[in-house]
Amino acid sequence: MWVLINLLILMIMVLISVAFLTLLERKILGYIQDRKGPNKIMLFGMFQPFSDALKLLSKEWFFFNYSNLFIYSPMLMFFLSLVMWILYPWFGFMYYIEFSILFMLLVLGLSVYPVLFVGWISNCNYAILGSMRLVSTMISFEINLFFLVFSLMMMVESFSFNEFFFFQNNIKFAILLYPLYLMMFTSMLIELNRTPFDLIEGESELVSGFNIEYHSSMFVLIFLSEYMNIMFMSVILSLMFYGFKYWSIKFILIYLFHICLIIWIRGILPRIRYDKLMNMCWTEMLMLVMIYLMYLYFMKEFLCI
């Protein structure tokens, strides 16, 4: 019973955090574009996200006949994003999950299917094109992501995130494996469909992308799932390359740094062309990842690191 209560509290806190993450993003983008951002509703615009949420949820929703998949796909997307937060050690009771890295890779692999269903069931050319782009991008870059995570697992010799705390007491992977850190951050941006890799939501080409037919509460579920993934991947990146304890101030600062960096990149970089993205994956990044994997294997096997 105590575990269920802790899980419920964690999920509520994550959902509230999404609201303030959107406010932070709008504030940072506002200052990048030489404007103030939201500042009218109550104290410095702090309640702007809740006002937007009420407006979205109060909009009319049309229920179509024989449209179960149309409704369930955003729910599945939201559920998969929420389920990943089980790995977060809230009050320490989930601290020793033995195969937590494999669980994360499994959920990330499954998260492609709801977006594919959303695009296909919408019966819209723009949505279908957005979903097709997502599938091709995920097929290309999940290979790189798997090898990057496998390199780190080989270093710590474990499938659990818990080992990253003990392995990085003396030196951080962000320093020791700096090229791997940059490639991991790039793969994370692609996995999250963020600028400059947000090709499935290209406004100039696809109007709104895969979610063009969604509104009201179903759009809220898609929106929440995207921003929960941003927060979770920032947590994982901070853990795997810095190894600070979850409750430490250092971990929180590194986590906020990654969040702000993702938002800052959105404000300054243009969207990459699709063919250049595929070329970067198959001819450049995959080769670098494989070379680095062999280099780390040599270090572990012959230098006894």
From Swiss-Prot:
It catalyses: a ubiquinone + NADH + 5 H(+)(in) = a ubiquinol + NAD(+) + 4 H(+)(out). Pfam families: NADHdh. Keywords: Electron transport, Membrane, Mitochondrion, Mitochondrion inner membrane, NAD, Respiratory chain, Translocase, Transmembrane, Transmembrane helix, Transport, Ubiquinone. Its main location: mitochondrion. PROSITE patterns: COMPLEX1_ND1_1 (PS00667), COMPLEX1_ND1_2 (PS00668). It is a multi-pass membrane protein. It is an enzyme of class 7 (translocase). The chain crosses the membrane at residues 1-21, 75-95, 101-121, 134-154, 173-193, 219-239, 249-269, 285-305. The keyword Translocase applies. Coiled coil: none annotated. GO terms for cellular component: mitochondrial inner membrane. One of its GO terms (biological process) is aerobic respiration. Its EC number is 7.1.1.2. Signal peptide: none annotated. InterPro entries: NADH_UbQ_OxRdtase_su1/FPO, NADH_UbQ_OxRdtase_su1_CS. GO terms for molecular function: NADH dehydrogenase (ubiquinone) activity. The keyword NAD applies. It is found in: Mitochondrion inner membrane. Belongs to the complex I subunit 1 family. Core subunit of the mitochondrial membrane respiratory chain NADH dehydrogenase (Complex I) that is believed to belong to the minimal assembly required for catalysis. Complex I functions in the transfer of electrons from NADH to the respiratory chain. The immediate electron acceptor for the enzyme is believed to be ubiquinone. This is NADH-ubiquinone oxidoreductase chain 1.
